[in-house]
Amino acid sequence: MSTIVLGDGPLGRAIGAALESRGDAVEVLGRPASGRHDSRALAAADLVVDASRARAVPDNVRAALDAGCRRFVIATTGWDATRVSVGENLRSTGAAAVVAPNLAPGAAIFLRLVEQAAALAAAMGGFEPAIVEWHRRAKADRPSGTARELIRRIDPFLRIDADEVAVVRAGTMPGHHTVAFDAAGETIELRLTARDRSAYAAGALAAIDWLRAAPRTPGIHPFDEVVDDLVAAATPGRDHQVPARPAA
């Protein structure tokens, strides 16, 4: 089995190095001169990791599908506008992809803690949510994919809009997110800070292993499915689900 990582930026290199360190066959490919990957260059891979740019995701997936690849991990954010069409292409070809705004294991825990906190804060009453996110100057999307996922998880319980997220783009910070639930006399804060990209690489490896462990339903799978299986295997018989979202 061989993995091809599309994108030779910091994230792509980190994922490639993590795969190499455990003895996996991997090739990291940067952006081709033509701007599009030739499917023939992807023919050796049984799994493709996309760590490129948002606008490249649909073409990258199409090229890999044409090459015969049927397993994907998409670690790129900011391509929500093409998510439906990418999902349709995956389903029509029998391919499966794990997609996440943030593949770090700690981020998976953080997202669940935030969702549980939002449910509790809404039940108690009197709290308003706030999000602050800080990334390196060069990060293109704003708010970050993780911030948008935080909004998606908080909003069913406590109303919050993307234009209310405080966004900082400065320095070389890999990723920092703070979520606050503020009331008249107190504030609850939950914070996640990525020190480097090794955490994202660890999550990518977990997603890769999950896809190869068993046949998966064609289409897009959230990283939560990977997390659920990891937790279930480690603590059988225990329920780790987040609270049910209120009816719309």
Label the predicted regions.
Residues A41-P58, V73-I74:
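Rossmann-like NAD(P)-binding element
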Residues T93-A147:
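Rossmann-fold dinucleotide-binding core
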Residues S2-L6, P10-L42, R55, G125-A247:
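C-terminal substrate-binding/catalytic lobe of Rossmann-fold NAD(P)-dependent oxidoreductases
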Residues G7, V49-S52, I74-T76, P101, ...:
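Small/polar loops that bind or transfer phosphate-bearing groups
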Residues L65-D66, R91, A122, D209:
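Residue-level signal for alpha-helix termini/capping positions
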Residues R55, D59-A63, A75-A100, A108-A119:
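Rossmann-fold NAD(P)-binding glycine/threonine-rich loop
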